[in-house]
């Protein structure tokens, strides 16, 4: 049979490729990866209240992305949690009973600690 041919609008686009290379230069020259690793270490300590929360069954972190599995009987947990987070000015990603925290690189330690505290408040009600 015939194969399905699929391509993207920007495949091989010279401007897009140059922009990507410039970003890689910034990552190398400005020490972005090392800075993110240091931030991830600080955030691991700041996230300790989530790791210890009685509703959290599995806390994990990969770099600057954190996730917790939540023990709850709410059948609509993800929808409920998302609404509660928005009400507290948080944009978090619950999928099923797992909540992901993926803050942008520009997040300060104080803002991250506030997000952790607000997430714990929501978990108190779960």
Residue ranges of predicted features:
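Conserved N-terminal phosphate-binding loop of PLP-dependent enzymes in the Aspartate aminotransferase
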Residues: 1-126
């Amino acid at each position: 049979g015939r194969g399905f041919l699929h391509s993207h609008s920007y495949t091989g686009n010279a401007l897009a490729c140059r922009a990507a290379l410039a970003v890689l230069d910034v990552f190398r020259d400005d020490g972005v990866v090392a800075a993110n690793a240091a931030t991830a270490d600080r955030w691991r300590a700041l996230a300790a209240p989530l790791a210890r929360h009685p509703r959290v069954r599995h806390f994990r972190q990969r770099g600057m992305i954190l996730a917790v599995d939540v023990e709850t009987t709410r059948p609509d947990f993800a929808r409920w949690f998302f609404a509660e987070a928005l009400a507290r000015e948080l944009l978090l990603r619950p999928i099923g009973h797992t909540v992901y925290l993926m803050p942008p690189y520009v997040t300060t330690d104080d803002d991250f600690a506030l997000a952790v505290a607000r997430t714990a408040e929501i978990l108190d009600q779960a």
